[in-house]
Amino acid sequence: MQENAYFCTVIHYYITKRKDVTAPEYKQLKAFARVDGALLAVLMIACFACYIAGLTSPLYGFLSIVAIVMMPFFAGIRLKRFRDTGLEGSISFMRGWAYICLMFFYGGLIFALAQYAYMAYMDKGYLVMTITNILALPENAEVIKQLGMADQVSESIHMLQAMRPIDFALNMLTTIIMGGIMLGLPIAAIMRRTRPLS
C-alpha cells in the first residue's frame, strides 16, 4: 500500500505542478484508470495463462504474443474513451501520460496478485520444470553448448528454482510499471488533443 501511495503521489505531483489537473479532475483520472487497469489486468492474466499453456502448445504461445502486442493498443483505446467521454474530447500530453501510467500500475497490481496466487498455490514447479525440459531437449542443448552458454543457462535455471512466488510477482509488477511509463509516452502523444469535441 505504501508503494501505491508513493507512485500515485509522484504522478499527482508532476501533473498538478504544471497546473494541468485540479484535485477533482485528478480523482476522476484515478477512478477511470482503476477501472481500465482492472480490464488491462484481465488481458494480462489471459496472456499469462496462454504463456503457461504455450509452453507445451504452440497455438497458446502465439495467442500469448498476440495478447502482449494488443496491450498498448488496448491502453490507447481506453485513453481515447476517457478523453472523449470523461474530458469532452480534450486531453493534454501530461494528463494522458499520467492516465496510462496509473492504468498500468493498477493493472499490474491486480496481475501481480493473480500471478502470486498461481505461483504459490497452483504451479507446483510446473513452469520451471517445463522450461528445464525444453532446454534439455537434444537440439536445444546442442545450440546452448555451441554458443558456450551451458554454465549461464544452468545458473539461470538454478536462479529460477530458487525464486519465491513473491519474487516472480514483484519482478512482473516492476516490469509492468516500467512498461507503462515507457509506453505511455507515445500513446499520450498520439491521443493528445487540445480542442474539445464540438
Language model: regions and residue ranges:
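Transmembrane alpha-helical insertion/packing segments
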Residues: 5-83
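Alpha-helical transmembrane segments of multi-pass membrane proteins
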Residues: 31-35, 39, 95-107
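C-terminal halves and exits of single transmembrane alpha-helices
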Residues: 101-125
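Membrane-interface interhelical loops and short interface/amphipathic helices
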Residues: 122-162
